């Protein structure tokens, strides 16, 4: 077998990936690691133009190509436009990672209709229509990878019902969408991160730890590490590595599943 055609496990050379909400945080790590594996990457952002463009340059340094496309995927017409533009960049689309989302905390008696709609519009409705457009545009044998959370099924957090529920719906989506997408041999899965050290983590970590407001951000991070038997924090690259596996040929037989990426917490 010639080197030109030899399959290298977990490589994504020749593939094109779109990652929504990838200007920073976990999404940026997904885009970076997909690029490191050889994929060309479309970095989607809603507002973080500067960081998205910087990420594009970092991905190019890995020896592949990348572009940034703006769209707010909480708005379906913009999602439709994003995919129409994405398919024109390199003429194909093989991997779609639905990452954009927001966090929310509030006791049941405090939650307003406006907050409910904000969270579900982005975390649930937005992801559903990203998946719809992905199915329309992906090549046969493509990958759809959605974003859940370990709080959707394994880790109940007080005052976190909206967020947890919005992510729990994703786990139901992937089970059914995996069947719906079978005609095109597209697999549909989700990753469910635990606490992951990003700027968002530092903003909200006090909610996850009882009495968390009494501690500094650094102290809360150290305490969070003990949620895992490995006694370390999760980082965006941990989530991204799972995504690369699901996107690869080696991940083909995983379908309709939600993969917990939380260090056993």
UniProtKB/Swiss-Prot annotation:
Induction info: The expression of the dibenzodioxocinones biosynthesis cluster is positively regulated by the transcription factor dibT.
Metabolic or biological pathway, per its Swiss-Prot or TrEMBL entry: Secondary metabolite biosynthesis
Annotated keywords: NADP, Oxidoreductase
Residues that, per the record, bind NADP(+): 26, 72, 99, 132, 163, 167, 198
Highest taxon in the source lineage: Eukaryota
Protein EC: 1.1.1.-
InterPro entries associated with the record: NAD(P)-bd_dom_sf, Sc_DH/Rdtase_CS, SDR_fam
Transmembrane segments: none
Matching SMART domains: PKS_KR
UniProt key word Oxidoreductase: yes
Molecular function terms, GO-annotated: oxidoreductase activity
Active-site residues per Swiss-Prot or TrEMBL entry: 148-149, 163, 167
Function: Short-chain dehydrogenase/reductase; part of the gene cluster that mediates the biosynthesis of dibenzodioxocinones such as pestalotiollide B, a novel class of inhibitors against cholesterol ester transfer protein (CEPT). The biosynthesis initiates from condensation of acetate and malonate units catalyzed by the non-reducing PKS pks8/GME11356. Pks8/GME11356 lacks a thioesterase (TE) domain, which is important to the cyclizing of the third ring of atrochrysone carboxylic acid, and the esterase GME11355 might play the role of TE and catalyzes the cyclization reaction of the C ring.
Protein family: Belongs to the short-chain dehydrogenases/reductases (SDR) family.
Designated name of the protein: Short-chain dehydrogenase/reductase GME11373
Protein's organism: Pestalotiopsis microspora
